[in-house]
Amino acid sequence: MRLFRSREVVGIAADALDFALEASAETHPNEYMGLLRGEEARRVGVDRDGYVVTDVLIIPGTVSDPYSATVRNDLVPNDFHAVGSIHSHPNGVLRPSDADLDTFGSGRVHIIIGSPYGPDDWEAFDQSGEVRDLDVLDADLSDPESFFDFTQDDIDAELDR
């Protein structure tokens, strides 16, 4: 079973992008890094085929400085909704470095956010490091507190997908 799904990522929820921009600004002057989680577009009220980035997962044990951020792979969850990665460049450069490209092999979309972390200070890339379109979408996201409200039936249904 693959960690990253092969279906196309059609956009990012505005709330998820806002969270990442704020987190990047708060982490400055160090790099910020997270993983992107997606849901089927229609499940979040978007009338399109494919996935929408709905969440940014912060991985415990991530170490960062002004030039890099490193995620501990042993702490990355086996999340079947993972669609890519996101990180900041405190120097504002919105191009992937060689080290970035080495991490782009898994996932369909990778986002780099640059200082000063405004609404247009980011770029999306494909696995090869080529710029790609990624629409900012108004998605119907669930209340984050509801994440912890589930039953065994919910778990079984998720595993059967």
Swiss-Prot record:
Residues 10-131 form the MPN domain. The record marks S97 as: Transition state stabilizer. InterPro entries: JAB_dom_prok, MPN. Zn(2+) binds at H87, H89, D100. Its cofactor is Zn(2+). GO terms for biological process: proteolysis. A motif (JAMM motif) lies at residues 87-100. One of its GO terms (molecular function) is metal ion binding. Binds 1 zinc ion per subunit. Keywords: Hydrolase, Metal-binding, Metalloprotease, Protease, Zinc. Transmembrane segments: none annotated. The active site is at E31. Monomer and homodimer. Belongs to the peptidase M67B family. Probable metalloprotease. Does not hydrolyze SAMP1- and SAMP2-protein conjugates, diglycine-AMC, Ub-AMC, hemoglobin, cytochrome c, carbonic anhydrase, creatinine phosphokinase, beta-amylase and bovine serum albumin. This is Probable metalloprotease HVO_1016. It comes from Haloferax volcanii (strain ATCC 29605 / DSM 3757 / JCM 8879 / NBRC 14742 / NCIMB 2012 / VKM B-1768 / DS2) (Halobacterium volcanii). The lineage of its organism: Archaea, Methanobacteriati, Methanobacteriota, Stenosarchaea group, Halobacteria.
